[in-house]
Amino acid sequence: MSRNQQLFDRAQQTIPGGVNSPVRAFRSVGGTPRFITRAEGAYMWDADGQRYIDYIGSWGPMIVGHAHPEVVRAVQETAAHSFSFGAPTEAEITMAEEICKLVPSIEQVRLVSSGTEATMSALRLARGFTGRDLIIKFEGCYHGHADSLLVKAGSGLLTFADTTQNAPSSAGVPADVTRHTMVLEYNNVEQLEQAFARHAGEIAAVIVEPVAGNMNLVRASDAFLKAMRELCTRDGAVLILDEVMTGFRVALGGAQAHYGIRPDLTCLGKVIGGGMPAAAFGGRRDIMARLAPLGGVYQAGTLSGNPLAVAAGLATLKLIQAPGFYDRLASQTRKLADGLAEAAKAAGVPFAADAIGGMFGIYFREGVPGSFAEVTRSDTARFNRFFHAMLDHGVYLAPSAFEAGFVSAQHDDAILAATLEAARKAFAAG
């Protein structure tokens, strides 16, 4: 029995399903999860000593690669002075200043510890600011596991939930909670316009992933985002961009810089923690002024602005501002996506791929999808076979057909070549 299997068997005795986040259980693809012992650069090693080229990157944060010396040094130096204080630090101010500098739509920012906290708090703030209850979200967009957002929420919920009904995607979420959440089709401008026409003056906020990464990678169209901005402005609703995944991942200023759109509030995470638990939400000063202790919208967190997370985040933000960083990252990611598509075509496999910044999506279907419905028509059985073949050849992809992939600054040409050679073998195997 492999060491991975031994650990999985042991884990299931004390951890529900043997994992602390459902997608890690390999339920979608089958087989035994890999228990990771260490990682460096673009590689990870499992408990059996197998090395993998990593295209998960801790689900996005590891944009400069695993265990980057400057990030490690920053954490070690901070840890020498204690791990947490429960009091303000100068580093928190520096982090806030850096975020506001790099993302101009953010005039003030509040640090939290997870993406779920960021989106949950941003929605509460939007409701408090507008005095309205109704929220619009979109099919396939995942904004964390807050109750009001678990409706057709993409990601692991595509694996575990019934997606045919406009109902909570998770047991334990009362229908009364989600009745204030309206779910619309991603990239459907007409449907969005109709919603605003029918509910004028009732909508507190629209929340959206500008590049959805939790129903695989699906880009928002320019027309969709433009309409969203115009409708929110006209109706007095708050536009929230969930950039937990895309922030500092698709461009230095996030997806909003790529698209040229200015939201009212932005949610960040992943990259800003450099692999540590950290997230943030911020935006217009007049909206943020409603947040406690200034205003009546309550939000708090014991570990918010944790010194170790802030240190890792600041070190990462410094590294990604190097000249040419994003040009090279985007080039390598596009090279990977195009190479995978070419390998599939040569093998006669229906397949498409897309890339933006350091994110990519692979789809076992003809054409790049533009909506949740199109994504769900992918050939998941074929993806599962491909996933295991790649794993056998030392390439670690996301263990779900409904997750985006991530490239780091450490994925050089030799690593891409090894990945594409593995892909050619995997496609040939069927």
UniProtKB/Swiss-Prot annotation:
GO molecular function, one term: transaminase activity
Cofactor: pyridoxal 5'-phosphate
Gene3D superfamilies: Aspartate Aminotransferase, domain 1, Type I PLP-dependent aspartate aminotransferase-like (Major domain)
GO biological process, one term: protoporphyrinogen IX biosynthetic process
Record key words, sorted: Cytoplasm, Isomerase, Porphyrin biosynthesis, Pyridoxal phosphate
PANTHER family attached to this UniProt entry: GLUTAMATE-1-SEMIALDEHYDE 2,1-AMINOMUTASE, GLUTAMATE-1-SEMIALDEHYDE 2,1-AMINOMUTASE 1, CHLOROPLASTIC-RELATED
Assembly with partners or alone: Homodimer.
Record protein name field: Glutamate-1-semialdehyde 2,1-aminomutase
Lineage, opening ranks: Bacteria, Pseudomonadati, Pseudomonadota, Betaproteobacteria, Burkholderiales
